[in-house]
Amino acid sequence: MAERFSSRLADVIRRPLITEKATRALEMNQYTFEVDPRAAKPDIKAAVEHLFDVKVIGVSTMNPPRRTRRVGRFAGRRSQVKKAVVRLAEGNSIQLFPES
């Protein structure tokens, strides 16, 4: 695991991504998260296993292109994001939606 995240695994995962595609992937025991752009796959795996107490069998990552945003005549770019799709072992799950 990379040195930069060894003491603070909670900083690797920023938030879960809830989209139509990510919701469909939940049926196949795959969860989608927005993660720190500097995080490597072993960092993401260790963070998910530590935070949610589950067994991870695979991690896929993607770096979508940054998007340009305008405010009046000034153009800027949104911050870099990295998405990770985490596959869990059979019988494991993460409670994303609280029971009410």
Swiss-Prot record:
GO terms for molecular function: rRNA binding; structural constituent of ribosome. The keyword rRNA-binding applies. NCBIfam families: PRK05738.1-3 (NF004359), PRK05738.2-4 (NF004363), PRK05738.3-1 (NF004365), PRK05738.3-2 (NF004366), PRK05738.3-4 (NF004368). Belongs to the universal ribosomal protein uL23 family. SUPFAM superfamilies: Ribosomal proteins S24e, L23 and L15e. The gene is rplW. Part of the 50S ribosomal subunit. Contacts protein L29, and trigger factor when it is bound to the ribosome. One of its GO terms (biological process) is translation. GO terms for cellular component: ribonucleoprotein complex; ribosome. This is Large ribosomal subunit protein uL23. HAMAP family: Ribosomal_uL23_B. Keywords: Ribonucleoprotein, Ribosomal protein, RNA-binding, rRNA-binding. Gene3D superfamilies: 3.30.70.330. One of the early assembly proteins it binds 23S rRNA. One of the proteins that surrounds the polypeptide exit tunnel on the outside of the ribosome. Forms the main docking site for trigger factor binding to the ribosome. It comes from Synechococcus sp. (strain RCC307).
